[in-house]
Amino acid sequence: MNQPSVIKLRELLDLLPHRYPFLLVDKVLSYDIEARSITAQKNVTINEPFFMGHFPNAPIMPGVLILEALAQAAGVLIGLVLENDRNKRIALFLGIQKAKFRQAVRPGDVLTLQADFSLISSKGGKAWAQARVDSQLVTEAELSFALVDKESI
């Protein structure tokens, strides 16, 4: 069932190990644990540190960071699924398949991050993820994750 509540920044910090300047999810718009699906948001501002060098006169969000934002959104859902185990285990980004970059992301854009898992197990997971700006598909990829004990890293 689709959860009605939005997950805002303070709660995200309990679900993800990332912090500024590498936290690339601003809030979760919706999630469905049973369907293994999540939709999150990243507000792309001119103040992002990466825009200083990518590119100063024509700022574009690096594609690898769009993929990272998608992975972080997926990581939030893994944290919600783990529930009682999330203090002991962590999802590590394992791989990217079938990545396509269709459109540039610029300051002022709002990225909508969608991840739908085909697999979540005790060892890891696999999700199809898409990023959109104004309903236009900008990036898509298959993401895979490994679940490991936090003490082992």
Swiss-Prot record:
GO biological process: fatty acid biosynthetic process; lipid A biosynthetic process
CDD domains listed in its UniProt record: FabZ
EC category: lyase
Localization: Cytoplasm
Name of one Pfam family that matches: FabA
Catalytic residue positions: 54
Alphabetized InterPro entries for the sequence: FabA_FabZ, FabZ, HotDog_dom_sf
GO cellular component: cytoplasm; membrane
Family per similarity comment: Belongs to the thioester dehydratase family. FabZ subfamily.
Function noted in UniProt: Involved in unsaturated fatty acids biosynthesis. Catalyzes the dehydration of short chain beta-hydroxyacyl-ACPs and long chain saturated and unsaturated beta-hydroxyacyl-ACPs.
Protein's UniProt name: 3-hydroxyacyl-[acyl-carrier-protein] dehydratase FabZ
